[in-house]
Amino acid sequence: MGKEKFERKKPHVNIGTIGHIDHGKTTLTAAITKTAGLLGQGKFIAYDEIDKAPEEKERGITIATAHVEYETATRHYAHVDCPGHADYIKNMITGAAQMDGAIIVVAATDGPMPQTREHILLARQVGVPYIVVFLNKCDMVDDEELLELVELEVRELLTSYGFPGDDVPVVRGSALKALESDDPNSDACKPIRELLAACDSYIPEPQRDIDKPFLMPIEDVFSISGRGTVVTGRVERGVIKVGEEVEIVGIKDTTKSTCTGVEMFRKLLDQGQAGDNIGALLRGVKRDDVERGQVLAAPKSITPHRKFKAEVYVLSKEEGGRHTPFFSGYRPQFYFRTTDITGVITLEEGVEMVMPGDNATFNVELIAPIAMELGLRFAIREGGRTVGAGVVSEIVE
């Protein structure tokens, strides 16, 4: 196993299978691991192992997710597959498994079905940036024209939800035939190799957190006599260097300052970066000007907002959520990063109420602005207990 260490140099990409029940997502996941295993680029994980994925808790929400990994010549992939439809919805909304791209599996025998649509819509709303199509069960369709029609239908569906349907790679094959083959160079495994090649070329390497604009959610504020005000927190992304200008965003009016010192484990540093727990010394900022719930950010990189649309999953009673539905005008707390902010919910037109265990689109107005961007995750709480999880899908104002 001396090779393992060296391989870690490959860029890491997060991916997952989505699509309608019984269209072959789990079979495809198993087939990919088998082909990769035969090529010496991963370990074969059998269908049953993936299918009985253990339940995990993410923000108090129970999600069953299988994680597998494999490599191509140029990349290391972490791949998620969920046994149930509800698990997918929870996964995508909570961001438990962040996806840089998704493989949508469509059975050629059925064409796009209701969950195919729902998963594509959710992928759009939660910001999954790229989709690759695997047209499965093609061995069961004799008519070439029928395959053409199904492919066209999938492309049109993707276009209707804002994905570039004409440019999306579509790979045809049979996941089951590939899974049954023991020769990675066989015709049965060829579609799997094509699919991985399509992922390699079509899904770009994700930008690393450290390369993004600096942002740190503020957890605590101290004043140090003779030195000024220190804010502490874990750097979410980017790098902060001593002497750089920063903005304090959210809750109050945005203010500017200069970072005059960075401290970590009581040592002075010249910079802090993504993943570091730091204290940042701010010039000319009073202790009372800053509070938990604001963020420290690179100038002009993020703005505060009060009104937004979100995709939300409402916890079921079994998950410790509410026992009763709620209606428009409901006023819970929205927990963003480090703090709770009260907000009022308006449901979409024609939606009467939302039941525990449902997912829905919310229109929210907060009582104070929060540093916000598309894809930002939050929890919905009532008296300190989580009753829902959501993701910002549109900023209104």
UniProtKB/Swiss-Prot annotation:
| UniProt keyword Methyltransferase present | no
Q: Where is this region: G2?
A: 60-64
Spell out the residue ranges making up region: G1.
19-26
Keyword annotations? Cytoplasm, Elongation factor, GTP-binding, Hydrolase, Magnesium, Metal-binding, Nucleotide-binding, Protein biosynthesis
Q: Please tell me where Mg(2+) binds in this chain.
A: T26
Could you say which EC number(s) this protein's record lists? 3.6.5.3
Annotated Gene Ontology cellular component terms: cytosol
Region listing for G3, in residue ranges? 81-84
Quick one: where's region G4?
136-139
Binding residue positions for GTP: 19-26, 81-85, 136-139
Record domain tr-type G: where: 10-207
Single GO MF descriptor: GTPase activity
Instruction: Provide the top EC class.
Output: hydrolase
Signal sequence interval, chain numbering: none
- Chain coiled-coil ranges: none
Stretch list, region G5: 174-176
Tell me the subunit arrangement.
Monomer.
Tell me which family the UniProt entry assigns to this protein: Belongs to the TRAFAC class translation factor GTPase superfamily. Classic translation factor GTPase family. EF-Tu/EF-1A subfamily.
What is the annotated role of this protein in its UniProt record?
GTP hydrolase that promotes the GTP-dependent binding of aminoacyl-tRNA to the A-site of ribosomes during protein biosynthesis.
**Name of the featured protein:** Elongation factor Tu
Origin organism is Nitratidesulfovibrio vulgaris (strain ATCC 29579 / DSM 644 / CCUG 34227 / NCIMB 8303 / VKM B-1760 / Hildenborough)
Please state the gene responsible for encoding this protein.
tuf
